[in-house]
């Protein structure tokens, strides 16, 4: 069953995961859940986007992907468990610094599968997708926030400070010899 898949997280990991998911499963309804309307508006290739506190009544998903991480992981996972159909799968990709409580009663009641993934094979598949669909790079360029030429430690410090102060996007350091 792959009628509808939800991805929680409107940051960089959620965006990258959603781009790849769209190319791997173009016929599956892709729904993005997040907390920032501006970030959600960048998911132009998704079928639907929803703020996590404004989910339509009766919305269900077949499978879920967690890309939230941090303190918000628990709320995201709880929401996934509530919306997912029985025997669905939840993939945990976001990193939390702390242990995250999970409602095992509902996991068991619904017969859900939970797994985490950061395996090398996943990254090998990523390279294959780049080769098959070069237009993916166009979508990924949307998350490049800044490019900084680096020749010194001061330049590196500047790049890291720029990166910390951005809401979205990655800073690329171009190393000069």
Feature roles, as predicted:
Residues 65, 91:
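N-terminal Rossmann-like NAD(P) cofactor-binding module of classical short-chain dehydrogenase/reductase
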Residues 83-86:
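Helix-to-beta-strand junctions that scaffold the AdoMet/dcAdoMet cofactor pocket
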Residues 93-112, 125-129:
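Rossmann-fold NAD(P)-binding glycine/threonine-rich loop
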Residues 78, 121-177:
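C-terminal hydrophobic helical "lid"/dimerization subdomain
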Residues 28, 88-89, 112:
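Glycine-centered, small-residue-biased loops immediately flanking beta-strands
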Residues 68-72, 95:
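Short glycine-/small-residue-rich Rossmann-like dinucleotide-binding loops
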Residues 55-64:
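A short acidic, Gly/Pro-enriched loop at the edge of an enzyme's catalytic core
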Residues 1-54:
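Mid-domain Rossmann-like dinucleotide-binding core that forms the NAD(H)/NADP(H) cofactor-binding site
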């Amino acid at each position: 069953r792959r009628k509808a898949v939800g991805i929680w997280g409107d940051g960089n990991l959620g965006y990258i995961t959603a781009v790849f998911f769209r190319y791997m499963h173009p016929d599956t309804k892709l729904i993005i859940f997040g907390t920032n309307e501006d970030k959600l508006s960048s998911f132009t290739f998704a079928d639907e986007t929803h703020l996590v506190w404004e989910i339509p009544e009766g919305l269900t998903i077949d499978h879920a992907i967690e890309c939230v991480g941090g303190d918000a992981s628990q709320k995201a996972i709880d929401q996934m468990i509530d919306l997912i159909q029985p025997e669905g799968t939840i993939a945990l990709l976001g990193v939390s610094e702390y242990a995250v409580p999970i409602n095992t009663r509902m996991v068991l009641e619904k017969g859900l599968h939970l797994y985490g993934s950061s395996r090398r094979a996943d990254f090998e598949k990523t390279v294959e997708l780049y080769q098959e669909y070069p237009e993916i790079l166009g979508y990924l360029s949307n998350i490049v926030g800044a490019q900084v030429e680096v020749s010194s430690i001061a330049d590196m410090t500047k790049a890291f400070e720029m990166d910390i102060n951005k809401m979205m996007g990655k800073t690329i350091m171009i190393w000069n010899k």
